Amino acid sequence: PLLQLNQIIISPIHQSVLKSSILEGMMAKKVTAVSFENLKDDSDSYPIVRSMSEIAGSAVMLIAAQYLGSANHGKGVLLGGISGIAPTKVIIIGAGIVGEYAARAALALGASVKVFDNNVYRLKRLQNNIGQRLWTSVIEPRMLAKQLKTCEVAVGALGSQTGRTPMVVTEEMVGNMRPGSVIIDVSIDRGGCFETSEITSHEHPIFMKYGVIHYCVPNIPSGFARTASQAISNVIMPLLLEAAE
């Protein structure tokens, strides 16, 4: 009802999770929708996607720290490490922008970080960007399953250029994880890379399965609205000013 005839909307569309009724309503009113996430710059990259990925990657460790606490039925452990206590073990699946910023945040907190990705170039780039040696591996199911058994936090940060994100963590792997550990599936807007993932919301962000806390909110940056808005403005304003000339 808020849409007007022939209206132009510049907004994130999230086509993969957009309800068909909303799309049909937009078509009926001949709405022109410009999708944030599909805007490219002169270098043929997606600047808004990059900014949102940086926010999501940094945020996942804050979210994980919250749900590891006893108040949220977590393991009651501090994300990171203090003197005399073994550091929290974090597994990151995906070495893109989200994975890089998640690794940065986890390392800054003192966690032990292990990164999986099937693209060796991305793994090398992540190590170079972070500036220190990291434990990295291609996604080999037996190795991944072994590491998931002993981790406190698992982050799904795989991307996909063709549609659905590869589902690399099976239900059996999740079932073998420690009770109270936390899964954050950042890839959920493209299907997710954990077989047990189901879309959640900011109002009801988590659910439990096999004793493991699942956080599967599709748009994590929207939980940090002011920062996300400023990042989007930094990209959109120059484009609008250029188009107006």
Residue ranges and their predicted role:
Residues A71-G159:
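Glycine-rich phosphate/diphosphate-binding loop of Rossmann-like nucleotide-binding domains
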Residues L23, M61, A102-A103, L123, ...:
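Generic hydrophobic/aromatic pocket-lining and core-packing "Φ" positions
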Residues P1-Y67:
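Phosphate/diphosphate ligand-binding glycine-rich loop within oxidoreductases
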Residues L5-N6, A86-K89, G180:
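Phosphate-coordination loops involved in phosphoryl transfer and adenosine-cofactor binding
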Residues N128-Y210:
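Rossmann-like adenosine-cofactor binding region
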Residues H14-Q15, V31, N38-D41, N118-V120, ...:
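Short, ordered loop/turn segments at secondary-structure junctions
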